[in-house]
Amino acid sequence: MFRVFNALTGAGSPKATELSGEERTKFILQQAHDFEIALQAMDYVLDDNAEVGLKLLADNQATSPGDATVGALAKGVIEFLEATLGFEPEVMKKASTTLAEAEQLSLKSRAKLQKLNIKTSSLYPPGTEYAVTYTESCLLHALLMLFSESMVEGAKALFKLRKAYHMLQDILKEINASEKRKRSSIYLQEINESTASFISSGTCFTSYDIPYKLTPEEEQDKELLDLANKVYSLRRKRLCGAHIGNSPAINRLRDDVGAASLKKGSDEETQEFQLLSDNANINQATMDEFIHSGVNLCFGILQVVLSLIPPAIGAVLSVVGFHGSREEGLRLVWKSTKDRNIHGGIGLLGLLFYYDGPFQFTDIDFDIPAARDDNLPVTEMDRPTLLHPGKILTSALLQARALFPNSALWLLQEARMLSKQGRLKEAVDLLDSIDHNTIEMKQVKALIVFEKATTLVYMHEFERGAETMLIMLSISEWSHALYTYFAGCCYLEMFRKYEMGILNGENAAEKKAYYKERATNLVFESANMVGKKKFMSKILPLDRFLLRKVDQFKKFQNIIKSSDPLDSIGVSPVHELIYFYNGYNRMTMKELNLSLKSLTEYRNPTIDLQNPDQELIKDLLTSLVLRRTGKIEEGCKILDTQVLPQLFTIQNDKVKYIKKTEDPWVYPTAFYERALFSWKLKGMNGLHEAHEWLIRAQNYQDDYELSTRIGMKIKAAKDRVEESI
């Protein structure tokens, strides 16, 4: 047996004909075992137990005679999840290094399996599984680069995506060929003759994990029997959720989101582990499952990512060789979620981020009905469902919550889902139901705290929002400057509420003085923190944003000659931050009206200057808040008369842009929001007009601190409109 593994690791190079049938079978089962261990380890991270997962990988590597490829990938996936959940430089660097190692190991393992002609699947050629591990490593590595929100890193990521794409094309050709072969009578005959679900009768056995008929000697080999039994047992436990130490998931399965549903329980609980999905197939070979789910996830994410890349770096797409189809990409990611493994878990996390995350990939105001595709097979998810998955997404999340009860990551996703539905109080109640100090993964701990802080801000509970945001300083290394600035802006809003008389009562003067002091210290101190914590060796986009804002405040202080620093802060800065995190789409009428009051009624020396740039921000935010409250025509009028004339003119039927630099995020955003008004006012008849505004938004784009974030939102909306024109 070790002759095969020596060949794979370069210690020897026997010809394929030199390998005995028994050695080949042992190798195939050992590889299936190693892949099952890797899948189990990666599931631990989905249950907030990354350390146990990493230890499992290390222990298996120390005892397994197999190669290290899938172990390196699994470690890279765990580190990738930790990195993208926390965006901390050291964690991202570590994940990048591990994924780069997995890329190289995958290429070597694939080449050697091809050379030795070791076929581990009844469907695919030798080495296909390592083509998938290579693709997965490349894709995750590229995503780390894209998440930097840097144009340079984004361009580098495209080259890595190209590698993943070309490998995926090779695998897809093999999958398509295998699909045709699966339908043939010859293949069905071979399957019936050579494989079945794991069966041990006396001293003979067969296994789906072995893609050929065993010899009589192999059927009676106890070592092979034990290894095949172990692989089957590992797979069965994983599919039933019995592999990571939790009680049966069926007892925790709910029918709705929200803290209230947590209280509902059955008096009768089963101790038997059951499959939660009809899609789970215990009799599917581990390698085939890994290949199918991996290709669906990787090619799906790849297409969605490429479809979202903003025009600022879109010119480089030609290097990749194709333009992604968001629709097809989403379908593939949805397919991956049907598999009970890490690919399904990552796919679901990606979908939840896409539909319910803070970056408006699917703006709820752009509720254009999707056209049905009558030519689509009934097994495929149609366009309306892709646009608004509704109960399907909820059910998938609730299943994950049941399978991984120890992970606050899935609780976070549930809170985001509630928040998107405008159920802000329920979202906070759910986040309050867990003590963040008990969460093992500090990245998830930080996400929980940050989500709670921002949700409290959307509810206008600014004091508690500030206090919660400041907790981030002790648990996250991402951006101490932003956390401090955000908290300072919250205290500023509390101070202004007392100034406006919205808040009053006992100890009002004392509280007002406290909020004033906290706001002054935190807002202006935040700028001094920039540069101490860097992301990918660069200053974070939002750090650059707050630097520019604090500089503005200081300039106004010189203009108004006031001894009070807070007099130099014009339009409510917390309302800018609310926009960046999609907060207005989550507010109820109560919060929207409070925001409107803050934006339009508060006065101080800087606001009284009626500085054109400050007025531009105020009018833009006011217009979209009015739209959310149903005053669409009033909001559109403000945008048309007060904002857009400062950004462009039409001369000889051609658009001429008035380039401004004071608040660069505002200008393309104004065109984007105007497109939304066209849709809201005119419906389907306004789509061509909306499309024109979105083109203008793209054309006004430039490389500024939030260009990637704003650009992706504009691109997503433009594609959505183009699908319906």
UniProtKB/Swiss-Prot annotation:
Transmembrane segments: none annotated. Its main location: cytoplasm. It is found in: Cytoplasm; Nucleus. It comes from the Eukaryota. Pfam families: Iml2-TPR_39. Keywords: Cytoplasm, Nucleus, Phosphoprotein. GO terms for cellular component: cytosol; mitochondrial outer membrane; nucleus. Interacts with lipid droplet proteins. PANTHER family: TETRATRICOPEPTIDE REPEAT PROTEIN 39 FAMILY MEMBER (PTHR31859), TETRATRICOPEPTIDE REPEAT PROTEIN 39C (PTHR31859:SF1). Inclusion body (IB) resident protein that interacts strongly with lipid droplet (LD) proteins. Involved in LD-mediated IB clearing after protein folding stress, probably by enabling access to the IBs of an LD-stored soluble sterol derivative that acts as a chaperone in inclusion clearing. Belongs to the IML2 family. This is Inclusion body clearance protein IML2. The gene is IML2.
